[in-house]
Every structure is written in C-alpha cells, then in structure tokens.
Amino acid sequence: MEKKIIKINDKDYVLEMTRNSIKWLEASGFSIDEFYKKPLTYFDLIWTSLFIANNKDVAQNPNLALKLIETYEKEGKKPAEIVKFGIEQYKAFMNALADIDLNLDEKIEIVE
C-alpha cells in the first residue's frame, strides 16, 4: 500500500491504509457501499483511519484526527484530497484480496 506524508502544524504525519486500519474502519461501521448515504461520517472515518497505522497519538485518541482535519483545512489545504487517497487505498486493498491467483491444476478436497 502507498503512504502519503502531510504536514500539519509543522509536524509530518505518515498516512497509510493498512490491514489494521481497515479493521478499525469496518469495526466503526464503515461500508464503501454506504459512503454516499453517510458522507460526512465516512469522510471523518476514512481521514482518521489513515492516521492509525503510523501515529500513536491518533491511534490512542481518534478524536485527535478530527482536530487535525480542522487545522489542515485552516492551513488552506484540502482534506478531501486525503480522503480520496484513503478511498483509493481501501479499494486497492479490497481488489488485492479478490485477486487470488488459484492454481487451476490444484485439487481441492472438501471435507464435511
């Protein structure tokens, strides 16, 4: 998965969508199919999930990510671009899970 580094209040934050951040997202109720039904809620969840893997402060206190989004916006930057990156990374992860290369010659035994 790709990483993105952003600067907020002169501090660098490494953003990344990982297996654990996706688990956190899903445990928080996120569903990509529902994104347009709850755009603000899911916008915040995706933003927060990107911080979880590499930023211990946010992992321990997800509400900190919401303060960071406000600051990022006040600095004239566009949080929507970061959320778009998060959605792309989420979809890439899901596509990778679905793209399992099965050896067609392999015999599979079903045991009941």
What are these regions (language model features)?
Residues T18:
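Residue-level signal for threonine
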